């Protein structure tokens, strides 16, 4: 039953995303949410607001830039992976290319981005050594053989209806984490690999599943289930956990898709009733791409003057669409609360023990 429930939920999500007009306006938020939660599993401490503020160019010193860059790099890796699937199958070459994007700057950029490891690594709490590690991935020769076998499994089972896609995803994720082929970034790559498999297969036309929400909420169990697979071969328990995560997050993402569509229709109606111009309608749509803005961004985004941008901001404030959040008299920053709040649900905060880097 867990498989049937997860498959049905995923189908609903794909259908819900297909029914959203101009779905490309909203994909960035789904991608950023997955990037944020996947990075938080590894200990990154920032929020969706921090990401969009950084991308706006208005980042402050209150949040370490290295944490924000880690998520921004994940977004770049995510987008790169989905784009490259059009021309390259999932395999060693694509994984290395995506990894190079993931660790292109900041934390981990000194850990051989884009290269499989040439030395032994291990999994354990911060400060652990090879002698005290909770798990030691295969040495280099065996690692290469295991990667070859994993790639063969991905390709051979793609056309085999006897093994359901979601079971394949769960098996591939756990095996990739066990192989741990990179010096850093394995956890994030393993979770991204699930989305890549779903999109490559056509089960998801758009990358709108944020599985890391579930994995973050159940982080200790997530790590424990993976450990049980490695140590005791507890594959069935792992797959049951994994499928429950697919079902829960797919249903949540479907609800969010419906809420996004309803919000857009409601706000467009409100702006039209208030006599909004075509440029203001254009700005409203752009806010789904960048929900934290300033006057300078608006001027550039819809090619208007500074006075016009200020007038649009006042109108959107009056309609309860934009809210000033900087508290400054100059260089003010505005937040699209109703949209961000659909995705910016509270989480348990940064990690503090074992990581799957």
Regions found by a protein language model. Name each.
Residues 1-357:
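FIC/Doc superfamily catalytic core
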């Amino acid at each position: 039953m867990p498989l049937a429930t997860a498959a049905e939920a995923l189908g609903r999500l794909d259908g819900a995303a297909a029914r959203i007009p101009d779905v490309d306006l909203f994909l960035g938020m789904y991608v950023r949410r997955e990037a944020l939660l996947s990075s938080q599993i590894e200990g990154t401490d920032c929020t969706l607001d921090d990401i969009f503020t950084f991308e706006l160019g208005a980042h402050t010193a209150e949040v370490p830039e290295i944490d924000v860059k880690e998520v921004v790099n994940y977004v770049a890796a995510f987008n790169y992976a989905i784009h490259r699937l059009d021309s390259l199958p999932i395999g060693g070459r694509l994984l290395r290319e995506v990894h190079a994007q993931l660790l292109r700057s900041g934390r981990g950029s000194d850990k051989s981005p884009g290269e499989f490891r040439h030395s032994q690594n291990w999994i354990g709490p911060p400060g652990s050594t090879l002698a005290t590690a909770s798990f030691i991935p295969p040495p280099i020769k065996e690692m290469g053989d295991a990667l070859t076998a994993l790639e063969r499994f991905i390709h051979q089972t793609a056309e085999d209806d006897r093994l359901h896609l979601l079971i394949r995803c769960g098996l591939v994720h756990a095996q990739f984490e066990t192989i741990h082929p990179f010096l850093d970034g394995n956890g994030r790559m393993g979770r991204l690999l699930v989305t890549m498999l779903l999109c490559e297969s056509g089960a998801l036309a758009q990358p709108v599943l944020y599985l890391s929400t579930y994995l973050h909420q159940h982080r200790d169990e997530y790590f424990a289930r993976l450990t049980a697979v490695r140590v005791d071969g507890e594959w069935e328990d792992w797959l049951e956990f994994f499928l429950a995560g697919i079902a829960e997050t797919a249903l949540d993402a479907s609800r969010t898709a419906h809420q996004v569509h309803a919000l857009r229709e409601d706000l467009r109606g409100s702006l039209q009733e208030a006599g909004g111009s075509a440029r203001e309608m254009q700005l409203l749509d752009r806010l789904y791409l960048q929900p934290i803005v300033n006057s300078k961004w608006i001027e550039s985004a819809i090619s208007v003057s500074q006075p016009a941008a200020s007038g649009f901001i006042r109108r959107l404030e009056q309609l309860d669409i934009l809210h000033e959040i900087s508290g400054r008299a100059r260089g003010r920053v505005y937040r699209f609360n109703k949209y961000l709040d659909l995705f910016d649900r509270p989480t348990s905060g940064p990690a503090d023990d074992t990581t799957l880097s």
